[in-house]
């Protein structure tokens, strides 16, 4: 993609997420309230139960985390709640406003002292990333369901690598090309209609992307088939659709590994050996 086209696309993407921040409708209470914030988080982790396991929020207590594409801040809050020092950024200013209000509300609760452990940035990660407030770079760069929405994900990953400690971890989620969602259904219940850019990757393509950015891939796992009946889901009711309601759980979990929509990628910035 040419530079001029990339700039236009970035502006289009920014406008899209400003007008409909991701997951903002996960809550039924008035947007911005504490009740709404709790509803958003509960629904997010209910329908994507693999996310907290993948992020392993408690693992990063006292560690420095860079979150690329924080959206409305659900995972940001979870990292903070478990003691991480978080720099969170997003292209969407409207999304960041919600993240700021949520961290402000939760930051009132002792003993977390969140205000001293959170920084928010309205930036395009292709162009600029913050430096760690501490020394030596970030312990974790985390991005869940974001990089497939940017024109140049390789550039973002290379930028991120330059801000990380040697041996630090990268944990990202990318959409899978060969999934139940893409092969057998036109409905995208968790995604938002009209998204201007949403790439999908094979396992090999995802591995190649991460390795081209200078990381060593440790694991790539496929997961997540959306089992809920859409007409109930949009009304915040959770009724499983056919065939998911009749499948034994072990069979469903096996299918997720084969036809899941989410590629969960763990990698590290290699330690550079000196002569």
Where do the protein language model's features map onto the residues?
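A conserved beta-strand element that flanks and buttresses the S-adenosyl-L-methionine
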Residues: 142
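A short glycine-rich, Lys/Arg-flanked "PGG" loop and its adjoining helix->strand segment in the class I
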Residues: 154-169
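Conserved catalytic loop of SAM-dependent methyltransferase domains
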Residues: 31-38, 212-243
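Acceptor-substrate binding/catalytic loop of class I
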Residues: 188-205
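Class I SAM-dependent methyltransferase SAM/SAH-binding core
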Residues: 64-68, 72-128
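Core SAM-dependent methyltransferase catalytic element
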Residues: 254-275
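Conserved class I S-adenosyl-L-methionine
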Residues: 2-61, 74, 169-193
